[in-house]
Regions:
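Acidic, Ser/Thr-rich low-complexity linear motifs
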Residues: 108-113, 193-201
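Active-site acid/base region of carbohydrate-active enzymes
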Residues: 1-45, 80-96, 100-114
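Aromatic (Trp/Tyr) and acidic
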Residues: 9-65, 69, 120-134, 138-141, ...
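Aromatic-lined, polymer-binding surfaces characteristic
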Residues: 59, 63, 67-77, 85-130, ...
Length: 315
């Protein structure tokens, strides 16, 4: 198997469905020979065309991301669930091999979205999971061109590698951290909060969380260059110091008042799930930020996601 490009609703009813996602479909495979709501005698098929659509065209970049995550999961699971750890590592290696074979047939430029950046992170996690030296050697050969192309994108992966590299690596990384420091200082000129505020169609608290995590590790390894105070800027923004209602964007956490309405599994109740992190303040051209706390269905402002919540836990 491989990563799917998309899993999508096939009918409008599914799209605006509220409540438990387990009831999104009837749980039967669609059979057009049956009438709507009719269930086959064997209890496996129905005449209701509500099956989800999986788009199965293969993107090796998605496979690399999956390989990275599976390798990291394998390392974390070892000693707790060894069978699952072994299965995760096996699939990580398989996806890594197959993705590289596919990309060799259709090469893409190095850098963000290209094989260089993705491979560096995957090689690092596979080394952590296996201890096999060829992975860390490949990582070391790839990370520097990745940083040269875009230090803001690559610095987090580079910092993750410090515990597994020698002192020469940290010395070589130092000027890149200094360059990253120039970027984070420039944020004070962009906005009064000193964090990367997104201006796209999806609100930008995810960028703020990632920024906070990166500067936290940078201050741990290079405290003479980057102060931990930068991480507090990210925390302040998430917990309410932002240009709208000053509510915390994290459910149940925050000094003034946490947001009480999120787009999640209980969105029909105009409620929240503790720990949800909202995308936050959506920029409306030409000069307005907004985050509605009385209407959950604007998912670009209010949706709590697994990826976003996990990133916050790490931060």
């Amino acid at each position: 198997g491989h990563m799917s490009q998309c899993l999508s609703n096939s009918v409008l009813y599914n799209y605006h469905h509220l409540g438990d996602a387990a009831s999104l479909t009837d749980g039967y495979h669609y059979d057009p020979s049956l009438k709507p709501y009719q269930v086959s005698a064997d209890g496996k098929r129905s005449g209701t065309p509500d099956d989800m659509w999986a788009f199965t065209s293969r993107n090796p970049q998605l496979d690399l991301r999956a390989s990275t995550m599976l390798a990291a999961a394998s390392h974390a699971l070892r000693g707790y669930n060894d069978d699952l750890a072994a299965r995760a590592l096996k699939q990580s290696k398989r996806l890594f091999k197959e993705a590289n074979e596919l990309m060799a047939k259709n090469p893409r430029p190095q850098g963000r979205g290209g094989m260089g950046g993705s491979n560096a992170a995957t090689n690092l996690q596979l080394y952590v999971a296996t201890g096999e030296k060829h992975y860390i050697e490949d990582f070391d050969a790839q990370i520097w061109s990745m940083l040269d192309m875009n230090v803001n994108f690559g610095i987090s992966t580079a910092l993750d590698a410090i515990p597994y590299m020698n002192d020469d690596y940290k010395t070589k990384l130092r000027p890149y951290v200094e360059k990253y420091k120039e970027y984070i200082d420039s944020l004070d000129e962009d906005n009064p909060y000193g964090v990367p505020i997104g201006l796209g169609n999806w609100a930008g608290s995810g960028n703020v969380v990632s920024f906070g995590t990166t500067v936290s590790f940078a201050s741990q390894y290079f405290p003479d260059i980057i102060s931990k105070d930068y991480a507090y800027k990210a925390m302040n923004y998430l917990f309410g110091c932002h240009p709208y209602h000053n509510y915390s964007l994290v459910a149940t956490v925050g000094a003034t008042r946490p947001k009480a309405v999120f787009y999640g599994n209980n969105r029909a109740d105009f409620s929240f799930i503790p720990g949800n992190v909202a995308p936050g303040l959506l920029f409306r051209h030409p000069d307005h930020f907004e985050n509605y706390d009385d209407w959950p269905f604007l998912w670009g402002q209010n949706e709590g996601t697994i990826a976003g919540n996990t990133s916050y836990v790490i931060f």
